[in-house]
């Protein structure tokens, strides 16, 4: 009888709660205001031939490479960062080898590593979600072939110091080291300039968050040109759809829109953290477009916020996140709605007298 591989049969499930998302969607770290108007205008003028033809990725890759200041052979557009993670697993992981992650973190690192037949080594974050650089290095072995680090991290919003990331890349020359910068725009610091020093270093970016193109599924993976040549062998030449390729240059061309949105999100993040601190709710200072907070009765909190038209994400099942919710930030008008509903919910549930932040 036909049966999937053992690695596939034992994979954990990842079922994001997409159904019934009615309300202000602050649960998936999306751009809550939407993409640039220039993208919408481009969509209106798509020609039938563009949809009838196989997509051509290279001209758009050249534009993205120019914007990032890298050479085109160092860059690959992907079907979201998810595909970038999958491609690295397929390129570098053999069954029985090891992939290293820091937990809590993005669930798909573990799933793609396990699908490749690898053993996943989970290194717990330090107290207050401090990045455990020493502990990561201590878990590097001759079997280590992939290390995946979200920076800023999801769901905590915390960051890894560049010196730790450099030390990890230096300590694991036979492993691919992925620094996933999905929330780069809200943080502003990158490891992109380090790629020439470390040929085993890869940087991923997405256009789902700040750029508001989550529905088009487009991201980018950057690394050493020789290594990227191997990654391209695993990738389909038609992995990014024609609509995404047509719209991305317009999104990139409207940096004023991105800058305004990012500035408002950062402002909203400060406002949320101030309200949480005033209510003595523990939270993790964030460098992303979300904040993780420990509210205790997370499921009740999520339901009460939903009743007030605000969707937030229960992260209680993540390592060390018992009783926690993750709240996405948007522009000022969305922060106003969020904070009003938040205070009402805290008062109603009687959880505004929790422990101090630290």
Feature map (PLM): residue ranges:
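Conserved PLP-anchoring active-site segment centered on the Schiff-base-forming lysine
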Residues: 91-112
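Conserved PLP-binding catalytic core of the aspartate aminotransferase-like
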Residues: 265-266, 274-308
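Active-site phosphate-binding strand-loop segment of PLP-dependent enzymes
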Residues: 121, 127-185
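PLP-dependent enzyme catalytic core of the Aspartate aminotransferase-like
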Residues: 307-308, 317-358
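N-terminal small-domain helix-loop-helix segment of the aminotransferase-like
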Residues: 2-82, 87, 349, 358
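PLP-dependent aminotransferase class I/II
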Residues: 200-284
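A short helix-loop-beta submotif of the ANL/AMP-binding
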Residues: 115-120
């Amino acid at each position: 009888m036909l049966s999937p591989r053992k690695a596939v049969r034992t994979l954990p499930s990842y079922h994001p709660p997409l159904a019934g998302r009615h309300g202000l969607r602050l649960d998936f770290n999306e751009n809550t205001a939407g993409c640039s108007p220039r993208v919408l205008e481009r969509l209106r003028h798509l020609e039938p031939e563009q949809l009838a033809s196989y997509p051509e990725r290279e001209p758009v890759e050249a534009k993205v490479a120019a914007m990032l200041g890298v050479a085109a052979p160092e860059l690959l557009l992907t079907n979201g960062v998810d595909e970038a993670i999958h491609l690295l697993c397929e390129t570098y992981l053999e069954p029985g080898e090891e992939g290293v992650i820091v937990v809590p973190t993005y669930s798909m690192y573990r799933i793609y590593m396990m699908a490749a037949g690898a053993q996943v080594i989970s290194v717990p974050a330090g107290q207050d979600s401090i990045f455990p650089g020493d502990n990561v290095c201590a878990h590097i072995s001759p079997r280590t072939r992939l290390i995946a680090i979200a920076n800023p991290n999801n769901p905590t919003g915390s960051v890894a110091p560049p010196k730790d990331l450099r030390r990890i890349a230096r300590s694991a020359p036979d492993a691919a080291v992925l620094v996933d910068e999905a929330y780069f725009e809200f943080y502003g610091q990158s490891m992109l300039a380090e790629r020439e020093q470390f040929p085993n270093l890869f940087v991923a970016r997405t256009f789902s968050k700040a750029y508001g193109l989550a529905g088009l599924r487009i991201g980018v993976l950057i690394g050493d040109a020789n290594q990227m040549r191997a990654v391209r062998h695993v990738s389909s030449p038609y992995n990014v759809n024609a609509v995404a390729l047509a719209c991305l240059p317009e999104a990139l061309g409207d940096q004023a829109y991105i800058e305004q949105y990012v500035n408002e999100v950062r402002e909203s993040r400060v406002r949320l953290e101030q309200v949480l601190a005033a209510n003595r709710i523990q939270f993790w200072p964030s460098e992303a477009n979300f904040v993780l907070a420990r509210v205790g009765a997370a499921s009740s909190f999520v339901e009460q916020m939903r009743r007030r038209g605000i969707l937030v994400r229960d992260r209680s099942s993540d390592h060390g996140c018992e009783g926690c919710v993750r709240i996405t930030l948007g522009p000022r008008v969305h922060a106003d709605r969020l904070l009003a509903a938040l205070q009402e919910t805290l008062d109603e549930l009687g959880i505004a007298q929790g422990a101090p932040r630290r």
